[in-house]
A protein has these predicted regions:
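Alpha-helical membrane segments of multi-pass proteins
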Residues: 1-668
């Protein structure tokens, strides 16, 4: 291991910790987040210990996620800095694990109504807290995932291992997003999505810059090499800045409410965090406008100047992190009372945390909105990057069909509407509306996205790398050509997954999980999109695929899928048992059809509406078949024009030989 690595990491940690500690103490004093509790006060150690430990949890997560991101997207696997990034990731994940243990204990001390005593009942009560309460289970999951990341990072040295460890590190932040202010707010699902998105991209931003500093101070790369690292990180930092800003505004909007509430203690801390974010954005602009150019030109002292800016930025990031931890312990202007604690709660509030919306009308599919920031950002960035790819090809004179761009943009717009508008809102209360969203997510949107040929565009528009690192192009092509996706992308396998998942999802606890838990809801959307995309790609995909089944087989698969959809729809239409009766049957709706009739309406939608995309698939398969035959005939005609019809000549010679007729002399 590089002997300068630990001193460099210590310097980075010190810079972050200085800003974090100062901002946290000032924030707790301003917002009253560490004031003694009126009942069963656990003491100052727990009151100050919880926000401090939680801040270290996020700091450790930033180090692990940011370092793994740099290894996956920035650093060459041949470079010594690659191994250093994994060491930093292991240290960060270990810090997250230990800090999560302390956070879980301090949370237990605060919510436990009796003074904590280490007697014979302590273990029993602690385990009841960890296994029997939502907040306890959340901390337990975070501890387990962080510990797993620590072990995994120590063991792996491959890109695949880095990718898996990175996913687990990101997943460890989800339980934290469901705690704090997001747990009690009325807009629970938008708050959780915004908090999770904010945490992940803040971790990428902070941890990535920390790794840049570690590389500069421990490996001392030449200016040109450091320019490559910093320029790649700068692009990631720009995206992270935009996402952190958007998610921060969303969080503030959900918790501050009226503009006058900005004069509260919570509003003052939000304003301070906005100032820190603006200053960090200015530092990012300085990188992209001046410092990177100086490094590229080899200006003497440019690396030293850049690192002074990096050091100041790290301290400022610590300030922003400290303010965030203080905000998490500060009372919000918008009251946060879970529905289960309301004196009088409606069935809808108990189940969903929200009041029952007005009676549904189909116009509300467009007029009713509830922001899901995660999917809104995915849609925006997917459109922006696709259009950028199209324009980049056009700029260098390469043609790209406009129809593909229209298909991709249309699919993404429909995805944004489906996840953020009326279908997403009312699907929670009406099975029929949920089924409309299902058909669109699994059939209409994937077909449009497949026709956009995103892999082909990415392979043409994104420059490849030659230094042993993996950029977006390398990751996309590696995924496309992996054996795993090759197996899942086989038409028969994709068809089985697409059809069988209907039965498995709706007639298992998965459906209940998707309704009751926001994580389950997000998984449901991803599953519908992924299974539909694999199915459509295997049949009519433009992007390269290892499988090229004959067109008659493709048509048979489409027809079989239509039959399976009809069977599924009929089972719902004539079924007399209610799916998830403890949800749809207990919602307390006084408008619309009764739950069983609504479910039967959903069956009609699954049968009728689902046939339109399937019919479109069948038409596209037939059209592709026809075009394939035309291309084959044209190739044959060109070959005949060039060398003659050798097959026909051989056949005629065989007939003449059988008839005893001598061969005719060839012309020319």
């Amino acid at each position: 291991m590089n002997t300068r690595l630990l001193p460099a990491l210590t310097s980075v940690f010190f810079l972050l910790l200085i800003g974090l500690s100062a901002a946290l103490l000032v924030g707790l004093a301003t917002g009253g987040g560490a004031q003694p509790l009126l009942l069963a006060d656990p003491g100052a150690i727990a009151r100050y210990g919880l926000p401090s430990a939680t801040a270290l949890v996020h700091l450790g997560a930033a180090l692990s996620i940011g370092s793994l991101m740099m290894a996956a997207l920035v650093i060459s696997s041949k470079d010594a800095a690659f191994n250093s990034s994994l060491v930093v990731a292991a240290i960060g994940a270990g810090l997250t694990t230990v800090a999560s243990v302390f956070s879980a204990f301090f949370t237990f001390a605060i919510i436990y109504v009796e003074p904590v005593s280490f007697d014979q009942r302590f273990g029993e009560v602690l385990w009841l807290y960890l296994g029997g309460t939502e907040v306890g289970r959340a901390w337990l999951v975070t501890i387990a995932l962080s510990a797993l990341v620590t072990v995994l990072v120590v063991m792996v040295r491959s890109f695949v291992g880095v990718f898996v460890a990175g996913l687990l590190a990101v997943a460890s932040l989800w339980p934290l997003a469901e705690q704090g202010h997001a747990a009690g707010t009325a807009n629970h699902e938008p708050a959780v999505s915004a908090s999770f998105t904010h945490s992940v991209f803040a971790a990428m931003w902070i941890g990535g810059l920390a790794m840049v500093a570690v590389i500069a101070w421990s490996h001392k790369p030449p200016a040109q090499k450091f320019h490559t690292v910093l320029s790649r990180y700068s692009t990631i930092a720009l995206v992270s800045f935009l996402v952190v800003a958007a998610s921060g505004v969303t969080n503030a909007w959900l918790r501050v409410g009226e503009a006058s509430a900005m004069f509260s203690a919570y509003g003052a801390l939000v304003a301070a965090k906005v100032v820190a974010l603006v200053l960090l954005g200015g530092a990012g602009a300085l990188y992209r406008t001046r410092l990177l150019a100086s490094l590229a030109s080899g200006v003497r002292g440019s690396t030293a100047v850049t690192m002074r800016v990096v050091a100041a930025e790290l301290a400022l990031m610590g300030v922003a992190s400290g303010l965030a931890s203080a905000l998490a312990r500060t009372a919000t202007p918008v009251p946060e009372i879970p529905a289960t604690e309301l004196a009088v709660a409606t069935p809808s509030e108990i189940l969903t945390g929200e009041l029952l919306p007005p009676e549904f009308e189909w116009s509300m599919v467009i007029t009713t909105w509830q922001l899901d920031l995660l999917w809104a950002l995915i849609v925006i960035f997917a459109i922006v990057y696709y259009v950028w790819g199209h324009l980049r090809l056009a700029k260098r004179g390469d043609a790209w069909p406009v129809g593909r761009t229209i298909a991709w943009v249309s699919g993404m717009v429909v995805l944004g509407i489906t996840t953020n508008a009326g279908l997403g809102v009312y699907g929670t209360y009406l099975f029929s509306v949920h089924m409309v969203a299902h058909m669109i997510l699994s059939m209409a949107i994937p077909l449009l996205l497949v026709l956009g040929a995103p892999v082909t565009l990415a392979s043409r528009a994104i420059a490849g790398r030659k230094d042993g690192s993996r950029g977006p192009r390398e990751w996309i092509l590696a995924a496309v050509h992996s054996r795993y996706l090759g197996f899942l992308g086989h038409p028969l396998v994709a068809a089985v997954i697409f059809g069988l998942s209907l039965i498995v999802f709706y007639y298992s606890p998965l459906f209940s999980w998707a309704l009751e838990d926001h994580l389950g809801h997000q998984w449901m959307i991803v599953h519908f999109l992924a299974s539909g995309y694999l199915f459509a790609q295997s049949l009519v995909g433009i992007d390269p695929t290892p499988h090229n089944p004959p067109y008659p087989l493709r048509l048979i698969i489409v027809l079989a899928t239509m039959g399976f959809h009809a069977f599924f729809g009929l089972s719902l239409i004539y079924g007399t048992g209610l799916l998830v009766p403890e949800w749809y049957g207990a919602m307390g709706r006084e408008w619309g059809p009764n739950p069983l009739l609504d479910q039967q309406n959903g069956g009609e939608i699954a049968w009728g509406l689902g046939e339109f995309p399937t019919l479109a698939l069948a038409i596209l398969v037939a059209w592709s078949w026809s075009r394939s035959d035309e291309r084959a005939n044209k190739r044959r005609d060109r070959r005949v024009d060039a060398v003659g019809d050798t097959e026909l000549d051989a056949y005629n010679e065989m007939l003449r030989a059988r008839a005893g007729v001598p061969d005719r002399p060839r012309k020319g």
